[in-house]
């Protein structure tokens, strides 16, 4: 019985430390430090994150010669470093796997660098889907 309880606790703790699928309101709260940064509103960020990763902090997209990581799909050729692309510019000075957890602090720091260097158009979903009719991306439960 004791080993079953121990195994159950390990399973619970393991799940608690894993990345997760966030809700709209969780993303809204987590991204508060991005509000109006670079002229981009919080609803625009929530919309962009949804259309970029589906709010999945573990999202990984393999392209022909690069990989994109996390909630914001940050690319390993320029912004972060991984084993696939060890000669990355690594402008954010970070390992790409840091974008795969539910601590968005490092993601937000890199997003700000991306905004400063290339602007919001880095995220193709923004212009196409997140520049108008943003009321649906608000969270009433703050």
UniProtKB/Swiss-Prot annotation:
Cysteine disulfide partners in this protein: 25-139, 47-130, 80-96, 92-110
Binding positions (Ca(2+)): 98, 101, 103, 106-107
Effect of residue 96 to G: In allele C, allele D and allele E
Keyword Signal: yes
Domain C-type lysozyme: 20-142
Keyword Calcium: yes
Source organism of this protein record: Bubalus bubalis
Record's protein name: Alpha-lactalbumin
Tissue-by-tissue expression: Mammary gland specific. Secreted in milk.
Note: In vitro digestion with trypsin produces a peptide comprising residues Ile-78 to Lys-98 which has antibacterial activity. It is active against Gram-negative bacterium E.coli (MIC=150 ug/ml) and against Gram-positive bacterium S.aureus (MIC=250 ug/ml).
PANTHER family: ALPHA-LACTALBUMIN, LYSOZYME C
Role according to the record: Regulatory subunit of lactose synthase, changes the substrate specificity of galactosyltransferase in the mammary gland making glucose a good acceptor substrate for this enzyme. This enables LS to synthesize lactose, the major carbohydrate component of milk. In other tissues, galactosyltransferase transfers galactose onto the N-acetylglucosamine of the oligosaccharide chains in glycoproteins.
Gene: LALBA
Record-linked SUPFAM superfamilies: Lysozyme-like
Cellular location(s): Secreted
Signal peptide: 1-18
Quaternary organization: Lactose synthase (LS) is a heterodimer of a catalytic component, beta1,4-galactosyltransferase (beta4Gal-T1) and a regulatory component, alpha-lactalbumin (LA).
InterPro entries noted in UniProt: Glyco_hydro_22, Glyco_hydro_22_CS, Lactalbumin, Lysozyme-like_dom_sf
Assigned protein family: Belongs to the glycosyl hydrolase 22 family.
One GO BP: defense response to Gram-positive bacterium
Pfam families in UniProt: Lys
């Amino acid at each position: 019985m004791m080993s079953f309880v121990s195994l159950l606790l390990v399973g619970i703790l393991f799940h608690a430390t894993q990345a997760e699928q966030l809700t709209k309101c969780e993303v809204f709260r987590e991204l508060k430090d991005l509000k109006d940064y670079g002229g981009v509103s919080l609803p625009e960020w929530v919309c962009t994150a949804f259309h970029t990763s589906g709010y999945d902090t573990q999202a990984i997209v393999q392209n022909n010669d690069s990989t994109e990581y996390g909630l914001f799909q940050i690319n390993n050729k320029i912004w972060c470093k991984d084993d696939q692309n060890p000669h990355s510019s690594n402008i954010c000075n970070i390992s790409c796997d840091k974008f795969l957890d539910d601590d968005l602090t490092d993601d937000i720091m890199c997003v700000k660098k991306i905004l400063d260097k290339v602007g919001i158009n880095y995220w193709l979903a923004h212009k196409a889907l997140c520049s108008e009719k943003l009321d649906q991306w608000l969270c009433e439960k703050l």
